[in-house]
From Swiss-Prot:
Protein's UniProt name: A-kinase anchor protein 14
Keywords: Cytoplasm
GO molecular function ontology, one term from the record: protein kinase A regulatory subunit binding
Keyword NAD attributed: no
Tissue expr: Present in cilia (at protein level). Expressed in tissues containing axoneme-based organelles (cilia and/or flagella): trachea and testis. Highly expressed in airway cilia.
Subcellular location: Cytoplasm
Source lineage: Eukaryota, Metazoa, Chordata, Craniata, Vertebrata
Pfam families reported for this sequence: AKAP28
InterPro entries, per the entry: AKAP, AKAP_28
Segments traversing the membrane: none
Subunit structure: Binds to type II regulatory subunits (RII).
């Protein structure tokens, strides 16, 4: 009889354990589901970001101009082409810019013509802007390429190291705004340095 009771109680315990294992979640399965959810969310976020990028490029395609060739190049034409590029790329009319030729560097196989573009926003309160941002343009004219080959154009922002190429990277006005805002914040932090006349 005790043997029958033991086997009956063993069966009851097995059934209790089976029922408990069905009602209690398995921690390994839960961790796996959490990891799977995280991967799925990351994937969905990447897809959404990519879709937003495609829509933005459809609405605002890369804007560029037809840059002059080696045979057409002059310093004055370089100034005009930079103006033309920005008139096509900059949508907000509040930005004022001026282009000036800085220098010509003679390298072994080419000449580098460097231009500086000043950016500022004038307002009714302050018609002459106290703060400006800048962009350095470099036009590379090769000594060895044929006259009908296009020149190589690149630009970098003030205090930046990343080189951009027109037609490959969209010029963003907020780069200039961020720089002018940072300069303005710096000037406000040290008014005793900048309020002198």
């Amino acid at each position: 009889m005790s043997e029958t009771q033991n086997s009956t109680s063993q069966k009851a315990m097995d059934e209790d354990n089976k029922a408990a294992s069905q009602t209690m979640p398995n921690t390994q399965d839960k961790n796996y589901e959490d990891e799977l959810t995280q991967v799925a969310l990351a994937l969905v976020e990447d897809v959404i970001n990519y879709a937003v990028k495609i829509v933005e490029e459809e609405r605002n395609p890369l804007k560029n101009i037809k840059w002059m060739t080696h045979g057409e190049f002059t310093v004055e034409k370089g100034l005009k082409q930079i103006d033309e590029y920005f008139s096509k790329c900059v949508s907000k009319k509040c930005w004022a810019h001026g282009v000036e030729f800085v220098e010509r560097k003679d390298l072994i196989h080419s000449f580098l013509y460097i231009y500086y573009v000043h950016w500022s926003i004038s307002t009714a309160d302050l018609p002459v802007a106290r703060i400006s941002a800048g962009t350095y343009f470099t036009m590379k004219v090769s000594k060895t390429k044929p006259p009908d080959a296009p020149i190589v154009v690149s630009y970098v922002g003030d205090h930046q190291a990343l080189v951009h190429r027109p037609g490959m990277v969209r010029f963003r006005e907020n780069w200039q705004k961020n720089l002018t805002d940072a300069k303005y914040s710096f000037m406000e932090s040290f008014p005793f340095l900048f309020n002198r006349v």
